[in-house]
Amino acid sequence: MHYGVVSPTGDLVHYTPVPLPGPRLPHDMTFTENYSILNDCPLFWKEDLIDRGIYATQFHRDMPTRLGVIPRYGTEKDIKWFECDATYVLHWINAYEEGNEIVVDGYFQFDPSPGVAPDATLEQRMFRFLDLFALQSRPYRWRLNMKTGTVKEGPLSDTITEFGMINALTAGKKYEWVYSTIPAVGWFGFEGIIKHNVVTGTEENYRLPDGVYASETVFAPRSSPRSEDDGYL
């Protein structure tokens, strides 16, 4: 894995290699005010097939998910790894520092490699990895204790959802709201938006009319916002 920091002008101002046990498939990452959080999930290419030009993934349920906390301008020797329950995280929501803990929120897939019927069509085989209901993707929180090295983790909600966005002004800081997609059952489509309060656990749904679909949303704050949630989607 390669970790770096890019300046506002697009220049690479810091770089360090991050050794891993083998090829991995990190899709996203998150950060706090002082740290970046890397991930090593146990869903990755079958190495024996790569040489044959076949790119097939396998989920290793007996391996932990590892989250690596690195100071923003740290190096390999500064990374602190935490072992967590096995999953694959496609997208992270946010992260922040709270006392001795790094709080990390993302979407935990309870079944990263869903099964398929022997007579399934090619379309069905492909879409099982795009069906959020098959993947059982839910908002989830990890608390990484930098002092003790322990982890506390668990779901923030039982709702199946993904592709969350926050008010960008709260990135890396303690926050309250995330706006996620309402997925369609059985295929890759979004039928609305879920507004989730990560402090109280409450949710509000906005569903689109039948036959209308959306992409992940973007939050645009007002020019003089009165609160984190004061803006537009």
Question: Which sequence ranges carry the predicted segments?
Answer:
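Beta-propeller domains
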Residues: 1-233
